[in-house]
């Protein structure tokens, strides 16, 4: 292959990505991907991040794209390199994150003939990518340059079209693989030619709106349930709906509604705990629910909504996805959040009755008041770590939350507050893998201090992700809650099967994580008191570099402490709310 032809062809591909909004590329080293990697680096408008492990790199790219909500290039060589992207692609699919995966490949004549480092990369990621194409080999005709430009434009468009998600372009390349950078590989300035594929905004159907407004006007006990939101516009729209119609908001931590605004009185942050009690479930039962975003993390909330399918439940989803795991939705409305709110607020009757909002506020306030009476000194009880951490986080920072117990504990213990910070997590497929790398990617996008709170098994899964912190000088403060195993299983029925539990589910590793931090050039601390944790965290969060703060907790006693605390608090809440 003439390397000037190849250079122009791949250069046109890269330049069109930039035209479509791409600014970042994550590159994994390899030979067959040489033209893709070098021309990405050569483009003045692409910022290239190089990571040597494909699984970590893919999650890092996921973090970049999740935080920026713009497409990120993810580049690898042929063979099993691309297969290591798979877990992150699955997460991107389910969490609706735009990724453009460029998998270099052998030319067609070297496929299925036993050539080295050649696997079948056609539709490698199956239904987890929105679009796939296998590029033609580079040619020099204007038609083929328009062809490769169109492929890039289409990839940009498809990744950003709702629901956002990953796409794959398979790029076969013949040797020689070194591009000729002496020519001008990006000819936009010469041709001023680009493709524009514009995405639209979903607006609610007028007939459906009329029916929904009728339901809203009849409702006396309306409620908003809010899962993960991505934009300030969405956040402001939900707050407007709540204020205008006096609807309490049950706000998931990832909704960005528990912090960063001055309307904490509208936010119910203790619903996960309140809905564990049957009497309170009935006391707080609505006659209408409007849900934005995916289902929140709270299992009691999910089971409550599932049980009460007789209640009108309206799900608003800009992509029209069927995100209704309880099969209890009465309406699924494909609409932009702000557009939906504008329409229903303008059409719905004005209401003055705040009694149902007050009922929720009373229960929420009662729970938080009684919870504050419990000592938060004992760090071996994980809840106390979260109760303290919420006050330590700096303004304009990011809390990246691990799956399994951390996201549930944040849901339980983090209260609504005005301090602005982001809470993020991988809640598409809810896996415990790739969390460290994703958190590092969020810093690369936002350049804000990042605190990662994570369990020991999840941290172990992605320890090699810490290499990015070392090589790219990314500051990261890790709060590692080490209960030496799978703590979440202690809350599940498996815990009652003592002969099997510890070996199959508890899975203690006995690892000394101090060595992991030192391996990647980080600091290590192991506070045992509230004051020590405060001092160590404050000393490190604004500093450059990797900082590992390990807190040993006890998963064996945690369950009984947690349940006893909840039982005691809920009894007090019921006395105040049901008997007053």
Curated annotation (Swiss-Prot):
Top-level taxon in the UniProt lineage: Bacteria
Signal sequence, renumbered to the chain: none
UniProt key word Phosphoprotein: no
UniProt keyword terms in alphabetical order: Magnesium, Manganese, Menaquinone biosynthesis, Metal-binding, Thiamine pyrophosphate, Transferase
Pathway field: Quinol/quinone metabolism; 1,4-dihydroxy-2-naphthoate biosynthesis; 1,4-dihydroxy-2-naphthoate from chorismate: step 2/7; Quinol/quinone metabolism; menaquinone biosynthesis
Requisite cofactors: Mg(2+); Mn(2+); thiamine diphosphate
Cofactor note: Binds 1 thiamine pyrophosphate per subunit.
GO biological process, any: menaquinone biosynthetic process
Alphabetical list of Gene3D superfamilies matching this protein: 3.40.50.970, TPP-binding domain
Reaction(s) the record says it catalyses: isochorismate + 2-oxoglutarate + H(+) = 5-enolpyruvoyl-6-hydroxy-2-succinyl-cyclohex-3-ene-1-carboxylate + CO2
Enzyme Commission identifier(s): 2.2.1.9
Molecular functions (GO terms): 2-succinyl-5-enolpyruvyl-6-hydroxy-3-cyclohexene-1-carboxylic-acid synthase activity; magnesium ion binding; manganese ion binding; thiamine pyrophosphate binding
Similarity annotation: Belongs to the TPP enzyme family. MenD subfamily.
Function: Catalyzes the thiamine diphosphate-dependent decarboxylation of 2-oxoglutarate and the subsequent addition of the resulting succinic semialdehyde-thiamine pyrophosphate anion to isochorismate to yield 2-succinyl-5-enolpyruvyl-6-hydroxy-3-cyclohexene-1-carboxylate (SEPHCHC).
Subunit structure: Homodimer.
Protein's name according to its UniProt entry: 2-succinyl-5-enolpyruvyl-6-hydroxy-3-cyclohexene-1-carboxylate synthase
UniProt organism field: Bacillus pumilus (strain SAFR-032)
